[in-house]
Amino acid sequence: VRKGQALEQLGVTLAVGDMLKPVSYEGVVPTVDAVIHTAQYGIQGRFTRKKFEQIEQADVLMTRTLSRACLACDKKLLYTSGVFNYGDHGDEWITEQTPLRPSPLGEAHTKMVEELLPLSREQHLRVILLSPGFVYGPGGLFKQSFYDTLQKGQLRIFGKGQNYWSIIHVDDLAAAYALAVESEAYGETYNIVDDQPLRLCDLVNTFTDAMGKKRVGAMATWLLKLLIGGPLVDSLVTSFRISNEKAKRELGWQPRYSTFKDGLPEV
């Protein structure tokens, strides 16, 4: 609510909706210049397969609703996909041409990508897909997952920590959306990540060093699965070493914070 009030003070008109109730948002589409779909269904507690199915149900319903509405009134749609669509590729560099073999967190988005791209080709849906890495910035999931757990003495590296994570500062992600909404590169996908993917252990160490805290240890994946859920852990231990060259080349995008170490002081 406070965030909404802050936006209203900036002149933003809010339209509050429910992902599972299309009537609460589909009528807004004809009134805007473009639709940017960044919504994700929120769940609480341990991530189970059933909860992942709830996330997929919500995303499928909202994405299909928005794509139909955008087709009906010829509006541009920016769809937020994600790097989990690619699945585990070890040390290999991943580009937009890399085949999708999603980890659990990427299954719903992959399903929608496979629907949206044919709609772009065959029915001329004006859609552009953005695939952000793990987003960090003040507050949000980053604060919950890293800062809060570190303060409680609960932060741990998942498994061996040798898998790559590709990340992005929230301000750089916003800049990419601003460029994409002005683009006419319909049917294209852009990976939005910084210049330096990090192994998970290095990412966590960079964070604890910046906080002036003692480096943390690792936790076995089997124990993590008991605590937070198998599908989530299977996603977080995948290796996604993502290239951002296409977004730089075609959108003219350049991350202000090219590495995690550069961006942390601003957080």
Task: Label each region the model flagged.
Residues 201-205, 225-254:
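Conserved C-terminal active-site "lid" loop/helix of NAD(P)H-dependent oxidoreductases
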Residues 110, 123-125, 135-146, 179-190, ...:
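Glycine/proline-rich active-site loop of Rossmann-fold NAD(P)-dependent oxidoreductases
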Residues 258-267:
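Amphipathic terminal alpha-helices
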Residues 1-64, 69:
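NAD(P)H-binding glycine-rich loop region in Rossmannoid oxidoreductase-like domains
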Residues 82, 114-138:
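Conserved beta-loop-beta element that borders a ligand/cofactor-binding pocket
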Residues 61-104:
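Conserved Rossmann-fold NAD(P)-dependent oxidoreductase catalytic core, especially the SDR/UDP-sugar
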Residues 176-231:
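Mid/C-terminal beta-alpha module of Rossmann-like enzyme folds, strongest
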Residues 127, 147-168:
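A conserved pocket-lining segment of Rossmann-fold NAD(P)-dependent short-chain dehydrogenase/reductase
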